[in-house]
A protein has these predicted regions:
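Basic, amphipathic "hinge/linker" alpha-helix immediately C-terminal to the N-terminal HTH DNA-binding motif
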Residues: 73-94
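Basic amphipathic alpha-helical segments that dock to polyanions
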Residues: 51-58
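N-terminal helix-turn-helix DNA-binding core of bacterial DNA-binding proteins
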Residues: 7-50
Length: 117
């Protein structure tokens, strides 16, 4: 994890996608990926394979739905929306990550032991 860009921990991409759809409404895969990149300040960069694998997984779990539509550039695209089950999962996952972040903040704030002579 020493790269300049962030490596995603298991489950974080799902949470990012669910939050993006909850905040922005229906979006196509490219739009979801770009929004995550923008909000992260380009710390998280997503390739097509990564985002579409996550979208398939979330759809299989019933957390998002998809329907075909037309994008801003008049191309056929699949648009994704968060479902009721997805909103419930988002609430649970967000609470978990907030607890974890709080624990990590406390751990990182712990003073280092001074070396003993």
């Amino acid at each position: 994890m020493g790269d300049s860009k962030l490596d995603l921990l298991q489950g974080t991409l799902d949470l990012m996608v669910l939050q993006t759809l909850a905040a922005m409404g229906s979006l196509h895969g490219y739009g979801i990926a770009r929004r995550i990149e923008q909000v992260s300040g380009d710390e998280v960069l997503l390739n097509q394979g990564t985002i579409y694998a996550a979208l398939v997984r979330l759809q299989q779990r019933g957390w998002i739905s998809a329907e075909w539509g037309t994008s801003d550039n008049n191309r056929k695209a699949k648009f994704y929306s968060i479902t009721k089950r997805g909103r419930k999962q988002l609430t649970e996952d967000a609470a978990y990550w907030q607890r974890l972040a709080s624990v990590m903040d406390r751990m990182l704030a712990m003073p280092e032991e001074e070396s003993k002579p």
